[in-house]
C-alpha cells in the first residue's frame, strides 16, 4: 500500500531516472542549431578536436557527451536522413553509463547504438557491438557505417563464414567491430590457444553493447561456449544403453512418503530430470549383465543409461532437435533456429543419435570453454539493448551488476493486448485459432501466428493448407529466408507462422491500408515459460504508434499449464461448467497463467545462478592460467629465471619426498631412489660420489646445482634468442595439454559432486575444495613437467631454428581440427647408450664415466 502511495506522489524509480536524463536532452537539443550551421569539414574538425582532448586526457567522455551526441545526431541527418529522437538520446546515455536500455520494437535501437559507440570509440580502445546472428551484424554495420565513416572511424564485421584469423584480426583492429556473441566468445578461446601474441586476433575488452541482451545473457547463459576435440572412448555403450532404455517402463512419482514410485523410472518434467527406481535398477543390471550398476567400474554405463532415458523421455524430435541429412541438429529453444555445429554435451547428443538410429559421432573432450556470463563480465564496461528486460531486472542486477532503464516510446503504444482464451484441449484450441485466422484473413488483416516448436508450426501449416489459406512458415527448417518472410508479415492478407522468436531484430512495417484494418494481429498459440518471450511476440505489433492486436490461445494440455498451474485453472473451468469447444476469458485466469510463468522463471534463475556459482570457480582458474599464458607469450617475460626457480622447487620437492620417507632406512637407499627418479624423469645419470656424506639440505642444493648446470649447458649450444623461444613453446605445450586434462577432471568432478548432498555435505563447498586441490596439482605439474620435457629434449642448432616454425604449424593444424578436433602426437625417442668406459662422445678425450657419464645427461630425445 505504502509503495503505491509513494509511486503516486514521487513516480517510479524508472520515472525519476528518465527525468534526470531529460534535463541533459534539453542541453543537447540546445546545441542542435550550432552544429547544423557548420559545413561537413567544420563538423569533422570539431569532432577531431574533441577526440584529441580525450586521447590527451584533457577531458572525460562525460564532459563532452552533450557535444558528441549533438554531432552524431547532425551526422545522422546528413548521411542517413535520420534524426535521433529525444528518447533515443536517453537510450544512448543509458548505454554509455553501462546499463540496459529497454526500448520497444521499432524504436530504432540500431540508430541509438551509434551515440555511445561513437563516444566510446574516441578513446581508441575499440568498441564491440554484439548481435544474435550474422544477418543483423552485417546489416547494422552496413547501415550505420555512413555515420562512423563520416567521423573517421573504421568499421569491421566478424561473420561465422569467415574462416581466416586474418579477417577476424582485421575486423578487431577497426575502431568499431560488429559480430555475434558466439564469434566473440570463440575468438577469445582460440586466442588463448595460440603460440604467439602476433597470432591473437582480439585486443582488450574495453566497451561492449549487446543487442537483444536478454536473449544472450539470460536465455543462452546456461549454454557454455566449448572448443572440443575427440576422445578415445568407445561408443558401444550408447547403443546398449538405448536398447535397455527402450525396454524400461515409465512410472509415476510417489505422492506420499510411505508410497514407492511405480515403474522402472520417473520423469520430473519440471526439473527435466530422470530418477530410476529400485525396480528399474534391478532390471537395468539384468539387461546389462552387471552386478552393480552404480559401482565405480560401471559409472560410465550408468551415465549412458541416464542420458538414453532423457533422450527418449525429455527430448522430442522437431521440438528440441531435428534430423537433417541423417544428423541430429539442435533447435535453439529461444529463437527456433537450428544451432548448426553445436552438440549437446555430456553424452546427450550421442544418446539422441542412438535413439534416432543415425551414426553416433565421437564423444568430445573439452579443450577450452567459457560461459557468456563470464565472457561479457570481462569487459570494462558492458551495456545492452532489448525490448524486454524488466521481467529479468533482478537477474541482470545480481549477476551482471546491470541496471535496467525503460525508455519511453517516441509515440504512445496503440496496440490492444486482449485477455487469454483458454480451452480444455489442444484440439479445441487449434480449431479456434484457425477460425480466428480465417476471420482476420477475410478482411485482409495480416496475422502473425507464434508457435513454441517446429512440430506445432507444422500442425498449423497443415490445417491452413486444408482451409486453402495462403501463408508462410518460418521455423528452423527454413531460417535462410527469415528476414524476407518477417518483413512481408505486415502486408495486407499475409498469414505468417513463426516459431517462437524467429525473425527477431527485423521490423514488421505496415501501410495505411493495413492500419485502417486494425494493424498486425499477433496470435500466440501457447504461453512460453518466460513472460519476456511472450512480450517479445506481442511487441512485433504496434511499432512506433501503429495500431495492432495481440491475443494468446491456451489449453489445459499446454506444457506450461499441465506442469505448473493446470489444476487451479481446471477447477475454475469445471466450476463454470465449460463445455467442449467453449473457452474462458478472465483476468483471474490470465493472472494464474502469469503466476505459473513466474514459478518457471524463478526456477530458471536459480538454475543459472547455480551454474554461475560453479563456473565462477572454474573461471578464476581459467583467468589465472590465461594470464600466466599471456605472460609466457610476452618476449619481455624472464622465462629463464622462472625455469631456474622451478629447478630449485623441483629439487626441494624431490629430495623432501625421498629423504623424509620413513620406509627408506639409510642414505644409500635414499640416493638409489633419487637416482632412479631423476633418471626416469629428467633423463640424467647421478653419480654417487657427488652426493656422498651430504645432509638433506646439501643434497637438495647439489641436485639443484647439477640440474641448473645441465639446463644451461643444453641451451648454450643454441643462440640465446632461439633458446628462449624453444623454452617458451615447450612450456606452452605442457601448459595447454595439462589444462585440457584439468578441464576433463573438472567435468568428472562436477558430474558426480551432487551425490555429496546425500552425505549431508554442500556440493558447492565440496566442489570448491576439490577443484582447488586439482588446480594446485595442475600448477605443480605445469612447473615440473615443463622441466622434465626440457631435460628430455635435445637439439642441434639447425633443429632449433626450424622448431618454432614447425610448432606454430602444428598448433594451427591442431586448432583447425577442433570442434574442432585433433591431438598432437609425441615424437619417438631416439636413445643413444654409451658404455661407461668408452671415450666420451663430446670429444674431451676422457672416459664417458668421468665426463658426461658423471652426474649429467643420460640420453637425448630429438624434438
Swiss-Prot record:
It is found in: Cell inner membrane; Cytoplasm. Zn(2+) binds at residues 840, 842, 851-852. ATP binds at residues 88, 106-110, 507. Residues 806-863 are annotated as: Disordered. The keyword Cell membrane applies. Its EC number is 7.4.2.8. One of its GO terms (biological process) is intracellular protein transmembrane transport. It catalyses: ATP + H2O + cellular proteinSide 1 = ADP + phosphate + cellular proteinSide 2. GO terms for molecular function: ATP binding; metal ion binding; protein-exporting ATPase activity. It is an enzyme of class 7 (translocase). Its main location: membrane. Keywords: ATP-binding, Cell inner membrane, Cell membrane, Cytoplasm, Membrane, Metal-binding, Nucleotide-binding, Protein transport, Translocase, Translocation, Transport, Zinc. GO terms for cellular component: cell envelope Sec protein transport complex; cytosol; plasma membrane. It is a peripheral membrane protein. May bind 1 zinc ion per subunit. Belongs to the SecA family. Part of the Sec protein translocase complex. Interacts with the SecYEG preprotein conducting channel. Has a central role in coupling the hydrolysis of ATP to the transfer of proteins into and across the cell membrane, serving as an ATP-driven molecular motor driving the stepwise translocation of polypeptide chains across the membrane. This is Protein translocase subunit SecA.
